[in-house]
Structure formats: structure tokens, C-alpha cells
Amino acid sequence: MNIHEYQAKAVLAKYGVPVPSGHAAFTPEEAVAKAKELGGPVWVVKAQIHAGGRGKAGGVKVVKSLDDVKKEATRLIGSTLVTHQTGPDGKEVNRLYIEDGSSISRELYLSILVDRATSRVSFIVSTEGGMDIEEVAKKTPEKILSFSVDPASGISGFHGRKVAYALGLEGDQVKQGVALIEKLYKAFVTEDMSMLEINPLVVTGEGNLLCLDAKVNFDSNALYRHKDIVELRDLTEEDPAEVEASKYDLNYIKLDGKIGCMVNGAGLAMATMDIIKLYGSEPANFLDVGGGATKEKVTAAFKIILSDPSVEGILVNIFGGIMRCDIIAEGVIAAAKEVSLSVPLVVRLEGTNVDLGKKIMAESGLPIISADNLADAAEKIVKAVKEAA
């Protein structure tokens, strides 16, 4: 789960992480009022969307008067911001963050993430922070360094010193860096984050470390332990279909293809998407119904797939272990009738009660194409979509 920058900074501030003073604003008038509270004389007006690259897209502006605060707030609120992370459609700006301006001596980069290859928490740092960090990663990857922390032993002073020296900090800044690393690590672990990015982490003109931006992603599987974090969720920033899927505990991710997929198990879902590409088409989504889907859950999954207007065909690929194939068949039939299915549907079932499941579909009176294996299913759905075009 993602949250906005201003929310991320509030979470980090609870752990003593140094962040600039600032306030969220939802109207130009509120932006001016919040700027007055901060006092100035320099403010930063920041668009709040769940995407990076805001600065280059005009979503972050430094201003030196209240009139300019209002001008930029008026320009941004209600506008659509297009960045390299939003895609061509962009994201609508519904809120701003009005922040104190800061004097900047150096811009650094620091992030923490879960390294699934090593099962450790990794720090990624660079002396080249700021808006061009992606270019740094592409052209001069040697300027980006990483260090890992064994979760069994946790963070120690030498980790902080290692990061501080890698960032080129000197004197009192090293002490600040060590303290900052320990605070960020504590926040990361305690709040069950999966990613924490500070870009830029700056050295101010006074020689202090300050987190000018913060991007946080939380492990969705651990949200039950953090009711306060769940309350920060902004559904307007998420795909409506993905929000609907989460209500039924479905793992759904929209893609750009035209063949909808409904599969049980992440591995089988990825294999299904791969074989669709192998047979010359593109998957429209990743959808894992899990191992304990009910008839209602399958019906909901079907509706979510068909809510995407680009879907021209559906492939259902189920291996019935915990899940029974007859339940899947009943759900598919109920959903097809409820939505008046008008696109080709190929169903491949295998496992528990597979014969009963196939019998239910065969006697449904619906034009459901049955497949014997994964390759057969992919070939049939790609062919059916082409013939229906």
C-alpha cells in the first residue's frame, strides 16, 4: 500500500527523522492559510500523487510570496500531472503539501527495501540524489552503492557509519547520519514497510541532514497490524478495479493486453500470461483468485475482468487442489449469465472434481470452450479472439 509524501513524513517524524515543517492543503485558499502558518519567506508547493517524477512534470514549485502560493495551488489542484511513472493518462491532483523552503548544500539519495534474493533489508545510497537519480542508475551505476542488514542481528552503529561514509558525510554529519540510519531502520521494520525512499536527502546550508522527500510502500500482508496506516489509504489514487478486487481478497493487476485471465496461484497466473504471449497475444490482467474461492468470489472476479473495456476474451485456468473445479464452474456460469457475456471464454480445469466441473459447464447452455491443457487453452483463446474481431 502506498501513501502520500506528507503522510510518509508524518510517519517518519514519529521516529525522530528530520523533515521540514509542512501542511496538507485541498484548496488554494487553504494552501495560502497553511503557508501563513509556516511563516515563510520561502515555501515549496508540492502536488500529492502516488507517483515519482513530480518535479520534472511541474508538480513541485518553490515560491517566495503568498500570491505565488495561491497561483501555483490554483494551477495544480484539479490538474492532471503526467510523469514517467503515471503513464500517458497521468494522475489528477486533489491535494497539495505546503512546506517550508530549505537551503540546500548537497543532494543525496537513500532508500531501504526488502531484498527478496538475500532475505535481508538493504540500504541503497548515492551521492547523486535529486530528480535525475534514474539517469544516474542508467549511466553511472557505480555511483549507487548498497549494504544489507541481517534481520537477526538488526541495525548497528557500523551500518550507519558505512552509509555515512558512502554518502561523503564528514564531521558532525557522520553522527547525524548514524542516528538517521537507525531511526529510518526502526521506522521501516516497526511499520512493516517494504520500501522507503528518501530522495533527496539533503545537507542544508547549516550542515544538517534533512529528508526533503519521502516515498513509502507498506507490506499489504501486514496491514492488519497497523490500523492507523490503513486509515491513510487514498482510494482515489488506485485503480478502481484493483480497489474492488481487494474487497474480495483477489489479487488483481491491470495490464495492457486484450485477453483477461482468471487463475488460482501466482505461479500459474504468470505461466498463463507467458503462454498467452507465446501464442501471439497479450494478457489484459493478472488475477489470482487464491486457493479458497467461493462462487461469489469467482463471480466478482469475472465482473472485474469484464469491467476493462479492452478485454476481448477470457481464459480461466484453474488447478483444483483446495479449490474444487465444480465451484469454479458454477461461479463462471453465474458470472457469464449475470454480465451477459459477449466475448469468447475458454476454461481449462484440472484437479478436484474436474469431471463434475466440466459436466456443469457442458450442460450450462453457454458457449464455453473447454481446454484439456494450458497450451490448448492459450491456443484456443487466441484463435477465438482473432475470429471474433
Swiss-Prot record:
Alphabetized InterPro entries for the sequence: ATP-grasp (IPR011761), ATP-grasp_succ-CoA_synth-type (IPR013650), ATP_grasp_subdomain_1 (IPR013815), SUCC_ACL_C (IPR005811), Succ_CoA_ligase-like_bsu (IPR005809), Succinyl-CoA_synth-like (IPR016102)
Binding of ATP, residues: K46, G53, R54, G55, E99, S102, E107
Binding site for Mg(2+): N199, D213
SUPFAM superfamilies: Glutathione synthetase ATP-binding domain-like, Succinyl-CoA synthetase domains
Reactions catalysed, as given in the entry: succinate + ATP + CoA = succinyl-CoA + ADP + phosphate; GTP + succinate + CoA = succinyl-CoA + GDP + phosphate
Co-factor requirement: Mg(2+)
Protein's recorded name: Succinate--CoA ligase [ADP-forming] subunit beta
Species this chain originates from: Parvibaculum lavamentivorans (strain DS-1 / DSM 13023 / NCIMB 13966)
